């Protein structure tokens, strides 16, 4: 297969996954946005975590809220738990890598805050511990997962929201996660500041 055919095949696979996900995920993304807006209206904040590409997604989400998405508006409180190398490495060194997010949540999380927990497999041990810590702090969890939802799905409470991408391919799951994050940012802005359409 020549390179351009391979590129087209990858584009088509991404399109197909997004089309399949659109109807399945729309109600879950809507519900997640309502949870997040309710938290923000009640002086709550967003905390976000994940590993690797999912860490990048956590940072992307937090930066879109803190700075801006597609319009000028006041900053919204959001913290990516993936960015402080001193904190991450001290926890990993002194305790365990599995606790790098949960210890931060126990310090920063408050009742009514929301945790955006991101894992393509749903089985990242440190994200699973983050969910447990969030529940201990009476936070609501929005989980971005893929495959069968993994261990994260089994931990979710009725008030939590899972956005599970219908794919087993990591790259396709990550692509839909980013789109879901952009949808969340758009819905948060439109609910808090009015629709621009």
From Swiss-Prot:
Enzyme type, top EC level: isomerase
Superkingdom per UniProt: Bacteria
Keywords: Carbohydrate metabolism, Cytoplasm, Isomerase, Metal-binding, Zinc
Residue ranges annotated for the SIS domain, each copy included: 36-197
EC number: 5.3.1.28
InterPro entries for the chain: GmhA/DiaA, Phosphoheptose_Isoase, SIS_dom, SIS_dom_sf, SIS_GmhA/DiaA_subfam
Subcellular location: Cytoplasm
CDD domains: SIS_GmhA (cd05006)
GO cellular component annotations of the record: cytoplasm
Cofactor dependence: Zn(2+)
Positions annotated to bind substrate: 51-53, 64, 93-94, 119-121, 124, 174
Keyword field contains Cytoplasm: yes
Subunit structure: Homotetramer.
Function: Catalyzes the isomerization of sedoheptulose 7-phosphate in D-glycero-D-manno-heptose 7-phosphate.
Further comment found in the protein's record: The reaction produces a racemic mixture of D-glycero-alpha-D-manno-heptose 7-phosphate and D-glycero-beta-D-manno-heptose 7-phosphate.
Listed name of the protein: Phosphoheptose isomerase
């Amino acid at each position: 297969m020549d390179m351009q055919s391979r590129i087209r095949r990858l584009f088509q696979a991404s399109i197909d996954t997004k089309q399949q996900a659109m109807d399945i995920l729309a109600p879950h993304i809507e519900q997640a946005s309502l949870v997040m807006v309710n938290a923000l209206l009640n002086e709550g904040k967003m905390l976000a975590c994940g590993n690797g590409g999912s860490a990048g997604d956590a940072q992307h989400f937090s930066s879109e809220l803190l700075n801006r998405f597609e319009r000028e508006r006041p900053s919204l409180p959001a913290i990516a738990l993936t960015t402080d190398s001193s904190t991450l490495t001290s926890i990993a060194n002194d305790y365990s890598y599995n606790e790098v997010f949960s210890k931060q949540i126990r310090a920063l999380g408050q009742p009514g805050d929301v945790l955006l927990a991101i894992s393509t497999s749903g089985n990242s041990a440190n994200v699973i511990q983050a969910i447990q810590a969030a529940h201990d702090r009476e936070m609501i969890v929005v989980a971005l997962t893929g495959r069968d939802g993994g261990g994260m799905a089994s931990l979710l409470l009725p008030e939590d929201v899972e956005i599970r991408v219908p794919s087993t391919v990591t790259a396709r799951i990550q692509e839909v996660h980013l789109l879901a994050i952009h949808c969340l940012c758009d819905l948060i802005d439109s609910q808090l500041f009015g629709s621009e359409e």
